[in-house]
Amino acid sequence: MNGSPTPKRYSSKSSRLYDDYYNIPYQYSNPTPMNRDYNDVGSRINADKLVPEEYKRNTEFINKAVQQNKELNFKLREKQNEIFELKKIAETLRSKLEKYVDITKKLEDQNLNLQIKISDLEKKLSDANSTFKEMRFPKVKDPMVDDDPVSENYDQINVPKHRAPDATGNPRTTNKVSNTSDQDSRLKAIERTLSVLTNYVMRSEDGNNDRMSPLPSPLNTILPINNRLNFQEPKRYNPTVKVNPSDDDIMMYESAELKRVEEEIEELKRKILVRKKHDLRKLSLNNQLQELQSMMDGDDNIKLDNVSKHNHATHRHSSQSSRDYSPSSDACLECSNDLYEKNRVKPENNMSETFATPTPNNR
């Protein structure tokens, strides 16, 4: 029992379940349970009967609306992600399209320039062929013929009855023969000069391939123009050469090119790494070699100093005894030789000493 003069001051309403046993208001009565879903007996109270049907329908409708809202938000996010990805793809395709348009323009310009060059070369070739033909086969001029031939009036011509045998020749035929002989001589001279020129050009070509080609002939003019322009066919598959390449072909070609470049970069990195390792190894070996050489130079200097400072008179070895004077002992060579000479005794004296009876010392 609370012995305080003011007991209500120390009791609170929130702690009814934990009141003292001697508290009079709750001594013979059960306090109300904290969980309102259960009655005093312990059975569950059916609260659904208390809630009206309209409230239930409203809650169900609200729950369904909330669920639908969540689903729609999820679908909206998915659609937004798809739109974002499509925008990225469209930007990449647009950039590629611009690049390919620029490439096509450049190729068209190059093609136009090449066509102009080909037309110029063909014109030069035709001019050279025509000049060569003119030089090789010049036009033979017809003999001089009078435009207004004199009408033959045999009545007015006085022909002698007795002509000399040498005078029977026609002057026109003699003129023709002389003209043909002159033309033959000219042709021969032109052929000789042409042969000399061709030989000179061939020699100059053999001496220097960068000079001009020899005079065009019907044989070497048949060569294709592509060989003269040094055109080379692409060795690798290139879809951009096609007239209308597909996007898949272009992307595959670009990915292959990127892969090839990456492989080349990796190969170069590997070579550089190996070279660095070799350089480091070379430096370490050079340092080690210098250290060993310095150590050997230092040991040689120490040995020379010891030999110069060595005094055989005061030298004492641990193995210096009457029995140890072999060259394999610790003594140096000179000391061992001296020791051998000192201890060398004749065999007779040595034997007598061994068999002699010991004499006692004089007291």
UniProtKB/Swiss-Prot annotation:
Query: Where is the protein localized?
Result: Nucleus; Cytoplasm, Cytoskeleton, Microtubule organizing center, Spindle pole body
Question: Known InterPro entries for this protein?
Answer: Spc42
User: Where in the sequence does UniProt note compositional bias of the Polar residues kind?
Assistant: 170-182, 349-363
What domain of life does the UniProt record list for this protein's source?
Eukaryota
One Pfam entry name: Spc42p
Q: Which UniProt keywords apply?
A: Coiled coil, Cytoplasm, Cytoskeleton, Nucleus, Phosphoprotein
Q: Which intervals of the chain are annotated as region Disordered?
A: 160-184, 310-363
Q: Per the record, what is one GO cellular component?
A: nucleus
Tagged with keyword Phosphoprotein: yes
Low complexity bias spans = 319-329
Report which residue ranges the record marks as coiled coil: 60-137, 249-298
Residues annotated with Phosphoserine modification: S213, S217, S284, S329
One GO MF term: structural constituent of cytoskeleton
The subunit field of the Swiss-Prot or TrEMBL record says: Component of the SPC110 complex containing at least CMD1, SPC29, SPC42 and SCP110.
What family is this? Belongs to the SPC42 family.
The protein's job, in short, is: Forms a polymeric layer at the periphery of the spindle pole body (SPB) central plaque which has an essential function during SPB duplication and may facilitate attachment of the SPB to the nuclear membrane.
Q: What is this protein called?
A: Spindle pole body component SPC42
State the organism of origin. Saccharomyces cerevisiae (strain ATCC 204508 / S288c) (Baker's yeast)
Could you tell me the gene encoding this protein? Answer: SPC42
